[in-house]
Amino acid sequence: MTKSELIERLASQQSHIPAKAVEDAVKEMLEHMASTLAQGERIEIRGFGSFSLHYRAPRTGRNPKTGDKVDLEGKYVPHFKPGKELRDRANIYGN
């Protein structure tokens, strides 16, 4: 599901709210989550999961075209850990 599809689905389920308001709310929520993570804070949504930053240590990689070694700097990457309810629902779908 893309962001546009999410906005469309929410707008159709909440017909009393204008589609533009739904779009603005979704965009604002995602922007707030991104800025919170960028500040190094953790986001927890009970039953859904948590977002945090994990550190990737510096390492030596390879250029896929040439095979040359490339030194990669350490960096923080976003990480999502699903909550129990989300894991359980995914298992129902997967079975």
UniProtKB/Swiss-Prot annotation:
Known function: This protein is one of the two subunits of integration host factor, a specific DNA-binding protein that functions in genetic recombination as well as in transcriptional and translational control.
Single Gene Ontology BP annotation: DNA recombination
Domain of life of the source: Bacteria
Pfam families: Bac_DNA_binding
Biased composition (Basic and acidic residues): 65-76
Family of this protein: Belongs to the bacterial histone-like protein family.
Stored Gene3D superfamilies: IHF-like DNA-binding proteins
Subunit structure: Heterodimer of an alpha and a beta chain.
GO cellular component: chromosome; cytosol
Keyword annotations from UniProtKB, A to Z: DNA recombination, DNA-binding, Transcription, Transcription regulation, Translation regulation
Record protein name field: Integration host factor subunit beta
A single GO molecular function term of this UniProt record: structural constituent of chromatin
CDD domains cross-referenced by the UniProt entry: IHF_B
Region (Disordered): 57-76
